[in-house]
Amino acid sequence: MSRSARPGNTVTLPPTTSTGTAMSSSQSSSSSSASSVVKRLDLSSRTAPPLGGLSLPLLSLEVRRRLRNRRSVIFSIVLPVAFFLMFTTTDYSAMPYGNGNVVANMMIGMALYGALMTTTGAGAAVSNERASGWSRQLRLTPLKPIAYITAKAIVGMLISALAIGAVYACGPVRHAQMPARVWISSALIIWLGSLVFVAFGLFVGYLLPSDNAMQVVGPLMALLAFLGGMFIPLTPGSTMDRIGSFTPMYGLHNLALWPMGAESFSWWWVVNVLTWLAVFLGGAAWKMGRDTARV
């Protein structure tokens, strides 16, 4: 007796048509392409870039960003030159100072001021980057924090060389006189010493929000320059000289003037520079560590 299939027991199998075959092949191809994408995005296969990510394109980007900032260029290069030309409208070329003249003294002070403004601004720029979210984006990349800080320092030093050169180029116009070795040695001391204020700028940049950082830096730098004797020479042993000897720019300014031979060398200048360098580095590392922990 033959059995007839009941409607309730009927099992419908998926058709093995060409359409089904096409769907199957399409799924397999999409799976293979997805797996290739996963392989390309496999984070475990990423390796740290050389030098922690420090590269010429990164430095070039930072330099362009700094030079596009008109306020930075004015305060770092134009303003020191304007101050030097303004303060030397009276002819001081006949007034001796060490193995040079008073004009050379004032030139060194204004060149130092411009260099410190440049390096401080390079460090303090992190405040704007934090506010815009740029620094947080960078921390999601393989770029190491030390490479990021090194890039800031190198860019600050490169532009500070422009500030020093701009002021020194105006020296002969105002009849600045000193031996060739003093021109070179004083410029090198200014350039290397300005690295201290990269740490100061970083400390301020991580300490204050972007709206306040640059507003604080400008007046504060002017006050420190005044206490360091860069605008008006301080009388040795005076009350202002004793107060200024504990401020960050005092040691750098006197070290830059030392090649002129007007004053004997003092180790207090070196202690002053190293102490403030330690303070600025410690403060910058502390604030940067807390900022990094947010990500």
Give, region by region, the residue ranges found by the protein language model:
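Short hydrophobic, aromatic-rich alpha-helical segments embedded in or entering the lipid bilayer
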Residues: 40, 50-58, 230-270
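Alpha-helical transmembrane segments and their short interhelical loops
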Residues: 145-215, 266-274, 278-284
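Helix-loop-helix units of permease transmembrane domains in multi-pass membrane transporters
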Residues: 125-157
